[in-house]
């Protein structure tokens, strides 16, 4: 391995990481309880502001990552026809559009958001691990996967705080959809492995878009009394 080439690649990854951190600086600046704080109170409005910004931040790079992977690895392979309705979260009954979401009680929609976010904790962890092992995987894809995993954790934490304020005392069972796709990400057969990545990124883009829409609807209902 060429030390100079490795140094350049490392510098590029560091630059991309710094750029990504800068882009989500606005989210970091919103009020949130510091680690270990006792009796820290953050308003429901501030919590929703942060959650909506995080969900948008997650959806945007999710779309970019899918598009980049599609262009680099999936052209001419017919993956899109196989990816339809094959997401691990399909077992969760999620509204497909705004009109359907408006028919759901806010309690149920809040819990649904929690379930979808929890369903992505494990696959996002393994996505980062497996992208690292891909030969010639672009640094941009790895960086986006790392950031999305981190922000999904933050969003889940924020949603738990929101549910705690909207329905204090209620504890929703940690229900989520189990992901069993790791063996496919590690397959020796290239087509099988690439489709597993493609499908996971396709589902991530889909679900992050849904979460983004659900949170905007919930914020409108609970913060602005549906006057938006």
UniProtKB/Swiss-Prot annotation:
Main location per the UniProt record: secreted
Family, as annotated: Belongs to the somatotropin/prolactin family.
Keyword hit for Magnesium: no
Quaternary structure annotation from Swiss-Prot or TrEMBL: Interacts with PRLR.
S-S pairs: 33-40, 87-203, 220-228
Keywords carried by this UniProt record: Disulfide bond, Hormone, Lactation, Phosphoprotein, Secreted, Signal
Gene Ontology BP annotations: cell surface receptor signaling pathway; female pregnancy; lactation; mammary gland development; positive regulation of lactation; positive regulation of receptor signaling pathway via JAK-STAT; response to nutrient levels
Molecular functions (GO terms): hormone activity; prolactin receptor binding
Signal peptide location: 1-29
Lineage: superkingdom: Eukaryota
Role description: Prolactin acts primarily on the mammary gland by promoting lactation.
The protein, known as: Prolactin
Gene coding for it: PRL
Taxonomic source organism: Monodelphis domestica
Single GO cellular component term: extracellular space
Positions carrying Phosphoserine: 55, 63, 119
